């Protein structure tokens, strides 16, 4: 496994720290022109930018003006508002023939300080003040990113980044990575508000999570749960949105489960039963209440002489007839499969691992079904 043929130089380099331009064919499959288009970690991307500034400063073949222009190209490509605010310091240093500073980025740390302060207030029985402080902190950071020239996004994995690139990114979009803790802060606020003030108060933060991470099933599922608490059965589309980007069996099963209940409440017995059956097929026994709910649904359907599917095959047929997703036969399955193959062929093993795990798990069987051959292959990508 340590042979250079199977672990080429640079194959374990993270996309955030690499400098690779992709061929047109690779760019099409990954939805990115270069390795930065696969980045998911803001901190690493910013550090790579700082390192590039130092490299530019040391380049004796460039004049000072050209150095400043190169640095601005880096800043514009990353498009982070905190880095953009430091542009004048970078260009001034390069024009003066000096090295660029080693910047410290503080937006994320400042947010963590406010989150910690809010938690202290919450545990001191100052719930309203805690919520107010936390909401002010996230609102400020939301505004900072909204005022920039890029599209602020959060990604939980490299596989999700590829899915986003292919399904959601617009032509020539400048995707900007937000601090991870901004996304988590919205999630925390949604959880706290849903418990203290009810589902309606949590909805704005859940909508913000969906906006930041449209390729992350958890965002859609949390929104669906709170909509259902409000007996808003239009929560079904949120479940379907989660299902269409689900790369994990548990996510897909839970999305089907939530969708089934929403459909039941809308008296759509056939699709509700189909979704319950698919949920249990994908992750058997994972949801304790599923079996009893399905039995009650079938009983009510029988009492009204409404036919419902009783097998996995029949359930899949019902879903397909209604133009509903039949997991894992969804668009993202082909996207991650092609992307995994390309990343391996292009010696980009870090994103290839995440993509390959997703491919292995997106199968028609029960359980993760990562067999010994797939496990050995995944090990080889870590060598």
Q: PLM features: what roles do these ranges have?
A:
Residues 73, 97, 109-112, 116, ...:
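"A position-specific structural signal for the A-helix of alpha-solenoid helical repeats
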Residues 82-85, 141-149, 216-220, 247-255, ...:
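Boundary/linker segments of alpha-helical solenoid repeat arrays
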Residues 121, 193, 227, 263, ...:
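Residue at a conserved register position within TPR or TPR-like alpha-solenoid repeats
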Residues 78-97, 158-176, 231-238, 261-274, ...:
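Alpha-helical linker/edge segments of TPR/alpha-solenoid repeat scaffolds
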Residues 99-106, 138-182, 207-212, 244-252, ...:
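Flexible helix-coil transition and linker loops at the boundaries of alpha-helical arrays
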Residues 135-139, 241-246, 264-288, 292-316, ...:
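TPR/TPR-like (Sel1-like) alpha-helical repeat modules
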């Amino acid at each position: 496994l340590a042979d250079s043929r199977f672990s080429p130089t640079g194959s374990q380099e993270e996309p955030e720290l690499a400098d690779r331009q992709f061929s047109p064919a690779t760019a099409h499959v990954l939805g990115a022109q270069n390795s930065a288009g696969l980045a998911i970690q803001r901190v690493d991307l910013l550090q790579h930018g700082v390192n590039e500034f130092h490299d530019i400063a040391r380049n004796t073949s460039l004049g000072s003006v050209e150095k400043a222009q190169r640095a601005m190209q880096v800043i514009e490509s990353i498009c982070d508002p905190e880095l953009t605010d430091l542009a004048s310091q970078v260009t001034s240093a390069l024009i003066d023939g000096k090295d660029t500073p080693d910047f410290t980025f503080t937006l994320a740390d400042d947010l963590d300080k406010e989150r910690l302060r809010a938690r202290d207030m919450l545990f001191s029985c100052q719930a309203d003040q805690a919520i107010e402080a936390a909401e002010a902190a996230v609102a400020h950071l939301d505004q900072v990113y909204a005022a920039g020239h890029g599209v602020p996004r959060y990604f939980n994995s490299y596989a999700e980044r590829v899915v986003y690139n292919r399904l959601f990114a617009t032509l020539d979009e400048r995707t900007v990575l937000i601090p991870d803790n901004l996304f988590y802060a919205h999630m925390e606020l949604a959880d706290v508000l849903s418990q203290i003030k009810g589902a309606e108060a949590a909805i704005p933060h859940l909508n913000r999570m969906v906006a930041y991470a449209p390729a992350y099933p958890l965002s859609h599922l949390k929104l669906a749960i709170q909509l259902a608490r409000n007996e808003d059965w239009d929560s079904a589309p949120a479940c379907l949105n989660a299902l269409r980007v689900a790369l994990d069996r548990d996510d897909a099963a839970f999305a089907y489960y939530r969708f089934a209940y929403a459909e039941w409440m809308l008296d759509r017995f056939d699709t509700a039963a189909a979704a319950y059956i698919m949920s249990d097929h994908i992750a058997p026994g994972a949801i304790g209440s599923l079996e009893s709910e399905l039995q009650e649904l079938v009983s009510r359907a029988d009492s009204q002489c409404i036919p419902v599917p009783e097998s996995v095959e029949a359930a899949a047929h019902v879903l397909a007839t209604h133009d509903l997703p039949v997991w894992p036969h969804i668009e993202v399955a082909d996207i991650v499969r092609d992307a995994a193959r390309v990343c391996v062929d292009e010696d980009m093993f870090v994103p290839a691992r995440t993509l390959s795990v997703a491919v292995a798990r997106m199968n028609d069987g029960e359980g993760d079904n990562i067999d010994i051959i797939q496990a050995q292959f995944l090990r080889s990508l870590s060598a």
